[in-house]
């Protein structure tokens, strides 16, 4: 059996060039990744190293704030799911401890009377900015500049995905027009020695939306499951690269042929870890259903049609409810002792 390999590193710059042969080779490599485990890394994109550096600085400045300041903008359904995600308030992997991380949810600043907010579309609303930062305006500007750059990169990646399916680049325009996305700043304290399974940085899970673009620091810790062998493969950091992984929406639309793989974070470095995932959800009203090119004769359709909002909201709700139940049970145990 061939030894499983970590996600390959692909030069995405050819997508923007005029070499049709090189572009076709990129499309073929991405297709192979989608059929394997849905993970690959890209270099040669248009997001500048300077913007990446400034955005990491924003994340670190936020997490350096006192807890009391961060909790002033704590995330809740009543706050449009924007703001601070407290340590261990999210359980990605059923049956495990909650995730050993804290985060900040950001997105486009939408007024409360925007149709998406009125209709309570997932994570749509005004941002909750940390007022305790000395350089708050700079923090806002950098965060939103980065959001815009990643939104465009996500649309470019989706265009390549359309090509991998032998559609035109514009095939998924109805999915990307009016799309929503979530930018998250994440901070992982060092993983306790000998506690790699009981409390993962992020438990094993599949992402819920269309695609994720992840910028990680040099600490590492991200692992993707090779399902045929059951091995966890380290996704080693590449300076400036984005880890791309397909999520459940594309897996549903391809009837499971394109993979949304299990992945997790185990911070075994003994150091703090920072990462910046960008979750491209897509147009919340887009109906994801099995594409005709993936309906093989005699093969049942695995999932009924559902809107992007329905697919993502159900999955996200489960992760929060699991963490709440776990923490409530733990508090009950401690109170009884």
Swiss-Prot record:
Domain of life: Eukaryota
All residue ranges annotated as the Fe2OG dioxygenase domain in the record: 179-282
Record's cofactor remark: Binds 1 Fe(2+) ion per subunit.
Biotechnology: Endocrocin and related anthraquinones compounds have interesting activities for medicinal uses, including anti-inflammatory activity.
Family according to the record: Belongs to the iron/ascorbate-dependent oxidoreductase family.
Reported consequences of knocking out the gene: Results in increased endocrocin production.
Binding site for Fe cation: 205, 207, 263
SUPFAM superfamilies for this protein: Clavaminate synthase-like
Induction trigger: Expression is positively regulated by the transcription factors brlA and laeA.
Lineage of source species: Eukaryota, Fungi, Dikarya, Ascomycota, Pezizomycotina
Gene Ontology biological-process annotations: endocrocin biosynthetic process
Tissue distribution: Endocrocin is specifically produced in conidia.
Name of the top EC class for this enzyme: oxidoreductase
Residue numbers binding 2-oxoglutarate: 273
Protein species of origin: Aspergillus fumigatus (strain ATCC MYA-4609 / CBS 101355 / FGSC A1100 / Af293)
EC number: 1.14.11.-
Keywords associated with the record: Dioxygenase, Iron, Metal-binding, Oxidoreductase
One Pfam family per UniProt: 2OG-FeII_Oxy
Known role: 2-oxoglutarate-Fe(II) type oxidoreductase; part of the gene cluster that mediates the biosynthesis of endocrocin, a simple anthraquinone interesting for many biotechnological applications. The pathway begins with the synthesis of atrochrysone thioester by the polyketide synthase (PKS) encA. The atrochrysone carboxyl ACP thioesterase encB then breaks the thioester bond and releases the atrochrysone carboxylic acid from encA. The atrochrysone carboxylic acid is then converted to endocrocin anthrone which is further oxidized into endocrocin by encC.
UniProt GO MF annotations: 2-oxoglutarate-dependent dioxygenase activity; metal ion binding
Name used for this protein in its record: 2-oxoglutarate-Fe(II) type oxidoreductase
The protein's annotated pathway: Secondary metabolite biosynthesis
Cofactor entry: Fe(2+)
